[in-house]
Structure formats: structure tokens, C-alpha cells
């Protein structure tokens, strides 16, 4: 089915879709695809790309706070609430289009207490992170909001992370059992549909 859909698109349609894809996707009339809006981040819809105001959204607790609750049910409810806000439509002063996608949740591991984005990630525990991510994604999905779990993978350091990609080294066992486990759980249990990659270069030995 996916191949059939792609085969219906022209080269120019594919090129325009890829080249105009940050925080939105363009409409493609030939296949009836509507334009979409997507927003960052893990504490709800935000707009750090411009000075435009956002209306009708909530600033939710940071994921590290949600992780401290150990409560998947309340995290799922938060996902449902964000999904409801996405449906509302009049979020941006520039647009009536509701948000279709959400760049969240952040499900990397607290490898160090000095991690620059630990507040965006649930825990140092891979199982807890996976359970809560799956719950949040499931809640958002139930309202028609697709999510981009992030940052895949081993994105536990902000310093130098996007200057040609920091080199991250780990054993295969650590990668599988600790760092990839939350992403696996989010897909298998939460039915995640999207992913945001990290900039780092990953090596093992």
C-alpha cells in the first residue's frame, strides 16, 4: 500500500514534500493529502521558531516530573489533553489549521545528572521511560494526534551535539537493554508512528 502511494507521486511532489517538511507538511492535491502542522515539544505545543503567539495550549509539567509520578494513567491523560488542544484549531495567530503532529515525547535516558535536556526525558530507567512514553503516545493517538518520539538514539549530551555530530560509544548490550528499550516499548505498546533522530554518530565495540 505504501509503495502504491509513493508511485503515484511525481518527483517534484516528493521533492517539495521533503524540502518543506519542518514543523509542517505541504498539501499534495493529486493524492488528496491535506497540509499539516506539527509542533514541538515534550511539555505541550510550543513555538520557538518565531515570535508568533500560540493560543489555547497548556504548559504541562516537564517529563522528569511526570516520570517521578510513576503513573502511566495520568501521563496517558496528559497525552489525551494535548491531543484535544491539537484539535481546537485556533492555536496560531497565523493559521486556523489544527496541529496534526507533535514532536514528543522525549524518551532518552538520564545517563548523567548533567544532561542538558534531562528535563525533557522521563528517567534514568529504561523500563519506566518506555511505559510512560507508550502511555503518552497512546493518549495523543486516541485524539488523532501523531507523535514523533525523540531523539533516536543515545542523545544524552547537548554539548557539541550538532557540530558534525558528537561520537557516542556504548556496547551493543547497553544500547539494546538501556538506550533503545524505551523506543521499542513506545512502538510496540504505544503504537508510535513517528520518530525524530539525533545528530550524534553512534559506535560500539
Where are these regions (language model features)?
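Glycoside hydrolase catalytic-domain context in secreted enzymes
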Residues: 1-205
Amino acid at each position: 500500500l505504501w509503495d502504491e502511494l509513493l508511485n503515484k507521486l511525481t518527483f517534484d511532489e516528493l521533492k517539495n514534500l521533503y524540502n518543506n517538511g519542518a514543523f509542517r507538511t505541504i498539501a499534495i492535491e493529486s493524492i488528496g493529502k491535506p497540509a499539516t502542522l506539527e509542533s514541538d515539544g515534550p511539555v505541550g505545543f510550543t513555538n520557538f521558531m518565531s515570535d508568533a503567539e500560540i493560543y489555547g495550549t497548556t504548559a504541562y509539567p516537564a517529563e522528569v516530573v511526570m516520570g517521578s509520578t510513576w503513573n502511566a494513567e495520568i501521563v496517558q491523560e496528559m497525552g489525551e489533553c494535548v491531543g484535544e488542544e491539537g484539535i481546537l484549531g485556533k492555536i496560531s495567530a497565523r493559521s486556523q489549521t489544527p496541529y496534526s503532529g507533535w514532536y514528543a515525547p522525549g524518551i532518552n535516558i538520564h545517563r548523567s545528572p548533567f544532561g542538558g535536556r534531562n528535563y525533557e526525558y522521563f528517567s534514568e530507567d529504561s523500563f519506566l521511560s518506555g511505559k510512560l512514553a507508550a502511555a503518552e503516545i497512546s493518549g495523543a493517538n486516541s485524539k488523532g494526534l501523531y507523535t514523533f518520539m525523540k531523539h533516536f538514539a543515545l542523545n544524552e549530551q547537548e554539548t557539541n551535539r550538532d557540530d558534525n555530530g558528537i561520537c557516542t560509544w556504548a556496547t551493543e548490550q547497553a544500547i539494546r537493554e538501556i538506550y533503545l528499550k524505551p523506543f521499542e516499548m513506545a512502538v510496540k505498546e504505544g503504537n508510535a508512528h513517528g520518530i525524530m533522530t539525533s545528530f550524534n554518530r553512534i559506535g560500539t565495540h
